Swiss-Prot record:
This is Anthranilate phosphoribosyltransferase. One of its GO terms (biological process) is L-tryptophan biosynthetic process. Keywords: Amino-acid biosynthesis, Aromatic amino acid biosynthesis, Glycosyltransferase, Magnesium, Metal-binding, Transferase, Tryptophan biosynthesis. Pathway: Amino-acid biosynthesis; L-tryptophan biosynthesis; L-tryptophan from chorismate: step 2/5. It comes from Psychrobacter sp. (strain PRwf-1). Mg(2+) 1 binds at S111, E245.
Length: 369
């Protein structure tokens, strides 16, 4: 039974309808809901009592209004109440690196590739992700292509984290109540509050994260949400070219939560000794294409078997180094962002990140499907 302060069990269908319609009317008037109101709405959704048409209207309305800090905090709190959590023993230097999605760029899976680099550098990675909803290659799609068995239990995922230093928390295995929202999200095919909630609801209780957002005006609000939820060291990043990653092409806005304070600043690739470059060639049409580019980049080799131009591979490495460097930094393995990027570059040259990916894939195949 979810440990939630609110329950819909004693509400009649008419009462649920009234709560939902009242909330929708306020949202459409661009009035923010209180945390208590949003907790009740999210509990109704998680209990499967929100009709699809109403859910679509609520998600669209929140998107158009822009979700408030209180609305996001309350929603994340309810999702965590309903989640199947795990508690890995090796929590020192534990990190997640994840994007909200919804940026429409169709880049290769930068955060997933970066996770293997961070793990190879010594971080414990609890990677939370899902299938692509508004992109052509979600992290789960990519990892299945790489040979990972995602049909494992939460406890088996915990075992991966403890033995391999990295595990992939496939959202449907941990957030089973989210099944009620999947049809509507797939039908909408645009970013919703659930894109925002994914990074906030890591079932391993990760306190150090790099989180990419689809628009940089979400950086500071989301950093404050993380503060509300008890996170320790977080970089919320959104680039000027509207990527939910640290961009190789331009400046990236950062809202950094550290020591209980949120600081906002801009970073450039040159800050970490990397030249700015266009993103041409880094977009993909499928998880297969994304995997090929990532394997070539993580291999450390100067040639590849996929027929990919080496300049594209080198560009992908630079993009991965920037984002993995941030993860290494917030995990506590680097004194600052540039030092983290330098560590990431060394890992990329060594080929250890690809070995980490292959080892995790092999380990997950030892579990019964």
């Amino acid at each position: 039974m979810p440990n939630t302060a609110l329950s819909t069990a004693e509400l009649t269908d008419d009462q649920v309808h009234d709560i939902l319609t009242t909330a929708l009317a306020r949202i459409l008037r661009r009035i923010d809901l209180t945390q208590q109101e949003m907790r009740q709405i999210m509990t109704i959704i998680m209990d499967g009592r929100c009709p699809d048409a109403m859910l679509g209207a609520l998600l669209t309305g929140l998107n158009m209004k822009s979700e408030s800090i209180d609305e996001i905090t309350a929603s994340a709190s309810v999702m965590l109440d309903f989640a199947k959590k795990i508690e890995p023993k090796n929590r020192t230097n534990m990190v997640d690196i994840v994007g909200t999605g919804g940026d429409g760029s169709n880049l290769f899976n930068v955060s997933t590739a970066s996770a293997f680099v961070a793990a190879a550098a010594g971080a414990t990675v609890a990677k939370h992700g899902n299938r692509g909803v508004s992109s052509k290659s979600g992290s789960s799609d990519l990892l299945e292509q790489a040979g990972l068995n995602l049909n494992i239990t939460p406890e088996q995922t915990r075992e991966c984290i403890e033995t391999q230093g990295i595990g992939f928390l496939f959202a449907p295995n941990h957030h089973t109540a989210m099944k009620h929202a999947i049809p509507v999200r797939r039908a909408l095919k645009v970013r919703t509050i659930f894109n925002i909630l994914g990074p906030l609801t890591n079932p391993a209780g990760v306190k150090n994260l790099v989180v990419g957002v689809f628009t940089d005006n979400m950086c500071e609000p989301l950093a404050h949400v993380f503060k509300n939820l008890g996170a320790k060291h977080v970089m919320v990043v959104g680039s000027k070219d509207r990527l939910d990653e640290i961009s190789l092409a331009t400046s990236t806005k950062v809202a950094e939560l550290k020591d209980g304070e949120v600081t906002v600043y801009d970073i450039f690739p040159e800050d970490a000794g990397i030249d700015s470059q266009t993103l041409v060639g880094l977009d993909v049409n499928s998880s297969e294409q994304s995997l090929q580019l990532i394997q070539a980049a993580l291999s450390g080799k100067e040639t590849n078997d996929f027929g990919i131009a080496q300049n594209k591979v080198n560009k992908a490495r630079d993009m991965i180094a920037l984002n993995a460097g941030a993860a290494i930094y917030v995990a506590g393995l680097a004194s600052n962002f540039p030092n983290g990027v330098n560590q990431a570059q060394n890992i990329l040259q060594s080929g250890k990140a690809l070995q980490k990916m292959q080892a995790l894939a092999e380990y997950t195949q030892t579990f019964d499907r």
